[in-house]
């Protein structure tokens, strides 16, 4: 049995992490590949990775094609590779829980208060021509778990985005009046230039060892690194942005977009109907002085098979509709940014519910709903302040609410169907001794977790038992 360690062990982990960071900072004397490509510092594109500045959004929507290519007729210019690594310490407020099958006391977090190497990523990121560019990220997750819950190292593709772009300029225009392009990506919203959407939204880094709420919408990570999306977009005078894409299971010729995923286990990966999963995005934005603002909407219809191993069945239908907004004030030395998003998902279990009614069980890995339709709603709000792009503080609120469904979420101690309702807040402090090293202290607190404030699992565990203190060191070079 894993025994919970108290304050002194966490203090030792903190000290070790800071020493490790000091060593990393000494080695991080090169900047990532896009900075080498453009000749700009990282802060030109990022408030703090991955939050984009107005210039960063322009760089992304022009297909990552600003600057020089790694290889031109004049010769070799730079290596289009970047590396990111993280180390961390996680403290779970109450690290003991009861195994529902055996009644034994077991740890929630197998490495509570330990200094761990979290993982690392390699980025192939570059302009290829004046009209084509992109990036692909390969990640090693040192804290991935297997079916038995044991920690095992695992690597696979992360976010990928490839773009083909064009530009139209009037006779006297200093910058293109119209940017248009196509994107191929493997995670809905990863192609979006604002940080109010899920793929690159806050929290940008969180503990992989912490307990998290069970329910999330499809567009909020449910399809990442499992699908292939192909679409087109236009951006007019930096004010009007519109995109329409369609998604397909990342198989056959697109299989590289889900490399490393478990495609042989039922439930190991998503399977969606061929190209019958539209994604849309519309946003109005404005820049004036040091300010920029955006208000928009995005969404997706997902027709998903209950089992990725059987695509002969009907599909469950998920309709996600979202609204979002962002504001940035960027000066030297003060920077303030804020993002908000609200996602409304309507779930129609056209395949799964029928199977439950007919056989008493779902199809394959499920889901196994008790209701023919459900809802799931997510709200996120975040504000960040940076001084001199070196000292940062963020406060965020998050909430998920949805239909009570015993088939999906179980029953509470009183015999009522549980809900997915969870909410809480995050407080984060950041310190960047140099622009490609970030030290972070993050505290996540839950007011409600998986449907209840107290005894949410029927074994006496409360929502605030999952409160998490997370110390993280991040370096890119």
Placement of each model-derived feature along the sequence:
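The canonical Cys-X-X-Cys-His
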Residues: 39-49
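Transmembrane beta-barrel architecture of outer-membrane proteins
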Residues: 29, 116-120, 157-161, 225-227, ...
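Sequence/structural segment immediately N-terminal to covalent heme-attachment motifs in c-type
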Residues: 31-41
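C-terminal segment of classical bacterial N-terminal signal peptides
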Residues: 19-28
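Detector for outer-membrane/organellar transmembrane beta-barrel domains
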Residues: 290-427, 431, 443
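Outer-membrane beta-barrel "beta-signal"
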Residues: 41, 437, 463-477
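Solvent-exposed loop segments that connect transmembrane elements
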Residues: 96-110, 145-152, 202-210, 253-273, ...
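Outer membrane beta-barrel
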Residues: 53-54, 81-94, 107-252, 274-290, ...
């Amino acid at each position: 049995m894993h025994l919970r360690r108290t304050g002194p062990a966490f203090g030792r982990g903190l000290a070790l992490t800071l020493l490790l960071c000091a060593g990393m900072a000494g080695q991080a004397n090169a900047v990532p590949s896009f900075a080498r490509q453009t000749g700009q510092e990282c802060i030109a594109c990022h408030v703090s990775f991955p939050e984009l500045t107005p210039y960063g959004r322009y760089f992304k929507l022009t297909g990552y094609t600003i600057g020089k290519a790694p290889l031109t007729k004049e010769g070799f210019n730079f290596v289009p590779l970047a590396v990111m690594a993280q180390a961390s310490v996680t403290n779970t407020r109450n690290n003991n829980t009861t195994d529902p099958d055996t009644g034994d006391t077991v740890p929630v977090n197998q490495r509570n208060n330990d200094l761990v190497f979290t993982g690392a990523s390699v980025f192939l990121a570059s302009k290829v021509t004046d009209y084509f560019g992109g990036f692909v990220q390969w990640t090693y997750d040192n804290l991935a778990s297997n079916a038995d819950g044991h920690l095992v190292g695992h690597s696979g593709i992360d976010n990928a985005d490839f773009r083909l772009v064009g530009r139209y300029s009037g006779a006297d225009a200093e910058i293109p009046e119209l940017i248009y392009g196509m994107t191929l990506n493997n995670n809905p919203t990863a192609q979006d230039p604002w940080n109010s959407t899920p793929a690159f939204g806050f929290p940008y880094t969180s503990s992989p060892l912490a307990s998290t709420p069970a329910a999330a919408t499809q567009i909020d990570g449910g399809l990442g690194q499992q699908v292939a999306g192909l679409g087109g977009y236009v951006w007019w005078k930096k004010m009007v942005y519109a995109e329409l894409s369609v998604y397909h299971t990342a198989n056959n010729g697109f299989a590289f977009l889900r490399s490393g995923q478990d495609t042989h286990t039922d439930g190991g990966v998503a399977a969606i109907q061929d190209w019958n999963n539209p994604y849309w995005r519309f946003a109005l934005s404005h820049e004036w002085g040091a300010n920029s603002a955006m208000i928009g909407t995005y969404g997706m219809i997902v027709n998903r098979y209950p089992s990725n191993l059987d695509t002969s069945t009907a599909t469950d239908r998920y309709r996600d509709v979202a609204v979002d907004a962002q504001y940035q004030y960027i000066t030297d030395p003060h920077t303030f940014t804020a993002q908000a998003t609200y996602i409304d998902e309507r779930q129609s279990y056209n395949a799964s519910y029928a199977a439950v009614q007919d056989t008493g069980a779902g199809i394959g890995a499920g889901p196994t709903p008790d209701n023919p339709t459900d809802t799931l709603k997510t709200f996120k709000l975040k504000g960040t302040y940076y001084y001199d792009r070196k000292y940062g503080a963020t406060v965020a609120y998050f909430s998920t609410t949805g239909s009570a469904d015993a088939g999906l979420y179980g029953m509470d101690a009183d015999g009522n169907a549980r809900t997915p309702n969870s909410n809480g807040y995050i407080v984060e402090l950041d310190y960047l001794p140099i622009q490609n090293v970030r030290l972070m202290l993050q505290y996540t607190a839950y007011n409600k977790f998986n449907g209840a404030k107290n005894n949410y699992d029927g074994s006496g565990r409360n929502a605030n038992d999952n409160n998490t203190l997370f110390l993280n060191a991040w370096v890119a070079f």
